[in-house]
């Protein structure tokens, strides 16, 4: 086939515009084609239907994300650290903490019992007491309207929604919630019972590693249709912590479910067999997910009135008399299954059994169960009467500090300002001795801080005095100089040695300077100076009887002198006894620039390269030119 001829820009534009017009004005055919391409809106049919699941929230997202990581990194070693994989949850937690709608209207009685009757406007939370809970803690009130998302009120049936405590003596104006617990819940998966279908994605739970995914409830007495997972109920991947014999709140992530201050989370206040059975189920299985209830908050103390105090003390006493006291069987047996499974750094393991619970009576006469058989980091014990004070050495966190200690990994909360808690964010301080009472002034102010300040001032003053004494001691001492090897240097001896060395160097330089100038020349110059001085002392007119002049004329040798041989013989006889070096006595040698006489063995042959002769010729010509120029300059005078 022949290639199509190339189109010009004008033809291409014309075809483009004509095609557009045809598409626009092509009639019903073009319209039908375009309508076929449009997606049909969702109707009653099954093909075009689009299902919008409004129930999917932060819980489902948080469940799905760690599952993928678990499946991929299931066999990798686990590092004990806080992994924030749920940004939406953190956002909702922050919104919940900063919200002004979360208030506690109930109070605690004088006997130390707490009422969980504050309203809960927070999103659902779950607390697993055998695995770390990374969700923020929430408080639940069961005698006031609960505007939170729907929850199931039955505690003896599987509940796939977050459990809540329910007060059955007041109406619940919250949104309707499911009443049947044997049907699947399309809401985000929370607790999982293996006798009901599990709509959540399959996940693995390893027994030897902490579960960083959102905690699930697992019933081990029924078959599990979901993929197999492993659950550890008492593994504590946190670092070992020293035991606190007098504290029940030594870790911010520990939940004591047997302590009176924290009755079983989310358990109801109707003292019916159903509630007792629910508590027994919690104690026996050890895996039921219950949401932690905060029993006291700063808002409670700020907003409760005197009337509310009086109104709620009676229910607290009634609750203590109806079987929720320290001797209640369900609470006493619940201490067996208090397991500390947080993800805090490794701690030292206690020497005692891990499941041993310690009971102590606080200052108000309330039983506290301090199951400190965990592996949290070592803290300093506060041995004063406050057994529920904050005595940990971990970074300060905002959290309630009553008998209910947290066993989750949720973000820090505000500290409750009770009488026995330290509500500031300063580093931990040393606790006073148990038998020592803090000193007070008559005005009631403590004197410990003043004493500490005075002690600091005294220490600083002592340091300054020591420094001053040290400076005065070595003020007039000489400086010790040392060489590289560390030996002391004597500067005086070094200066003397340097002076002697300088003198030696100067003498050697003078000697080399004489040798460089020439010894014979220097002696000849010295002789000439002496002769000149001697001639200067003579009178200006010299006569014929001058002895020096007569001797000089007699010693001269002249050619053709008949008496020359006779004179030589006489000199030889005279100098015979004297040791004189032999000297050249032949024909006159050619001159040289140093005027050196040849040796007595020279045979009279000039063996030089003629440099001396050329030099003298150049000097003679230069002198001749100067004389000629001078004569030309004075010729006209």
Swiss-Prot record:
Residues annotated as region Disordered?
A: 18-53, 104-470, 553-595
Which positions bear Phosphotyrosine? 512
Polar residues bias: start-end ranges: 260-275, 318-335
Q: Where is the composition biased (Basic and acidic residues)?
A: 108-119, 295-315, 353-362, 453-465
Q: Which residues carry this modification: Phosphoserine?
A: 135, 148, 161, 174, 187, 213, 226, 238, 259, 264, 272, 284-285, 297, 341, 344, 371, 373, 376, 410, 426, 585
**Record flagged with keyword Transcription:** no
Establish whether keyword Phosphoprotein is in the entry: yes
Cellular compartment(s)? Nucleus
Query: Which residue windows does the record flag with biased composition (Basic residues)?
Result: 430-439
Q: Which Pfam families match?
A: Bud13
Q: Which residues carry this modification: Phosphothreonine?
A: 131, 144, 157, 170, 183, 196, 209, 222
Q: Which UniProt keywords apply?
A: Coiled coil, Isopeptide bond, mRNA processing, mRNA splicing, Nucleus, Phosphoprotein, Spliceosome, Ubl conjugation
Q: Name one GO cellular component term.
A: nucleus
Q: Which InterPro entries match?
A: Bud13, CWC26_splicing_factor
Coiled-coil annotation reads 490-538
Q: Which PANTHER family match?
A: BUD13 HOMOLOG
Which family is this sequence assigned to?
Answer: Belongs to the CWC26 family.
Q: What does this protein do?
A: Involved in pre-mRNA splicing as component of the activated spliceosome. As a component of the minor spliceosome, involved in the splicing of U12-type introns in pre-mRNAs.
Per UniProt, subunit arrangement is: Part of the activated spliceosome B/catalytic step 1 spliceosome, one of the forms of the spliceosome which has a well-formed active site but still cannot catalyze the branching reaction and is composed of at least 52 proteins, the U2, U5 and U6 snRNAs and the pre-mRNA. Component of the minor spliceosome, which splices U12-type introns.
Name listed for the protein in its UniProt record: BUD13 homolog
Organism per entry: Mus musculus
């Amino acid at each position: 086939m022949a290639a199509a001829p190339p189109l010009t820009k004008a033809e291409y534009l014309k075809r483009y515009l004509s095609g557009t017009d045809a598409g626009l004005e092509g009639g019903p055919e073009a319209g039908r084609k375009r309508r076929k391409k449009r997606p049909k809106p969702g109707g009653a049919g099954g093909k075009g239907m689009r299902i919008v699941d409004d129930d999917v929230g932060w819980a489902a997202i948080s469940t799905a994300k760690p599952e993928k990581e678990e499946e991929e990194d299931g066999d990798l070693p686990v590092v004990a650290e806080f992994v924030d994989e749920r940004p939406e949850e953190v956002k909702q937690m922050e919104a919940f903490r900063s919200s002004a709608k979360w208030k506690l209207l109930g109070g605690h009685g004088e006997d130390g019992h707490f009422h969980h009757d504050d309203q809960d406007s927070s999103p659902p939370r779950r607390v697993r007491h055998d695995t770390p809970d990374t969700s923020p803690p929430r408080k639940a009130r069961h005698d006031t309207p609960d505007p939170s998302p729907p929850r199931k009120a039955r505690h003896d049936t599987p509940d796939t929604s977050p459990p809540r405590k329910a007060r059955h003596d007041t109406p619940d104006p919250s949104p309707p919630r499911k009443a049947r617990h044997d049907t699947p819940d399309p809401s985000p998966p929370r607790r999982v019972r293996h006798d009901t279908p599990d709509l959540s994605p399959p996940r693995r739970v390893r027994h030897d590693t902490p579960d960083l995914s959102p905690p699930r409830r697992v019933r081990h007495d029924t078959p599990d249709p979901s993929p197999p997972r492993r659950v550890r109920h008492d593994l504590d991947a946190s670092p070992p912590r020293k035991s606190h014999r007098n504290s029940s709140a030594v870790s911010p992530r520990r939940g004591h479910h047997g302590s009176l201050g924290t009755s079983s989370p989310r358990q109801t206040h109707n003292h019916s067999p159903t509630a007792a059975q629910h508590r027994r189920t919690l104690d026996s299985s050890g895996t039921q997910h219950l949401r932690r209830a905060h029993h006291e908050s700063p808002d409670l103390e700020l907003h409760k009135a005197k009337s509310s105090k009086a109104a709620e003390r009676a229910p607290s006493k009634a609750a203590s008399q109806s079987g929720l006291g320290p001797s209640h069987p369900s609470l006493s047996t619940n201490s067996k299954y208090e397991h500390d499974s947080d993800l805090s750094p490794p701690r030292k393991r206690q020497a005692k059994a891990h499941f041993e619970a310690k009971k102590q009576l606080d200052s108000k006469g309330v039983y506290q169960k301090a199951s400190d058989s965990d592996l949290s980091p070592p803290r300093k014990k506060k041995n004063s009467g406050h057994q529920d004070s904050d005595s940990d050495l971990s970074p300060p966190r905002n959290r309630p500090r009553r008998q209910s200690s947290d066993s989750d990994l949720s973000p820090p909360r505000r500290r409750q300002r009770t009488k026995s808690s330290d509500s500031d964010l300063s580093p931990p301080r040393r606790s006073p001795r148990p038998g020592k009472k803090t000193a007070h002034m008559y005005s009631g102010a403590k004197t410990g801080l003043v004493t500490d300040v005075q002690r600091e001032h005294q220490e600083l003053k002592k340091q300054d005095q020591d420094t001053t004494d040290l400076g005065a001691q070595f003020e007039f001492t000489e400086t010790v100089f040392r060489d590289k090897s560390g030996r002391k240097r004597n500067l005086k001896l070094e200066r003397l040695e340097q002076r002697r060395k300088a003198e030696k160097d100067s003498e050697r330089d003078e000697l080399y300077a004489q040798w460089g100038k020439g010894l014979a020349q220097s002696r000849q110059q010295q002789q000439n100076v002496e002769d000149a001085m001697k001639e200067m002392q003579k009178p200006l007119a010299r006569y014929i009887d001058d002895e020096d002049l007569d001797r000089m004329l007699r010693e001269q040798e002249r050619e053709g002198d008949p008496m020359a041989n006779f004179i030589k013989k006489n000199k030889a006889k005279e100098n015979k006894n004297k040791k004189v070096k032999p000297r050249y006595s032949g024909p006159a040698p050619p001159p040289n620039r140093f005027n050196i006489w040849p040796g007595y063995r020279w045979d009279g042959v000039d063996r030089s390269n003629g440099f001396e002769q050329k030099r003298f010729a150049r000097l003679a010509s230069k002198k001749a030119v100067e004389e000629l120029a001078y004569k030309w300059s004075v010729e006209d005078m």
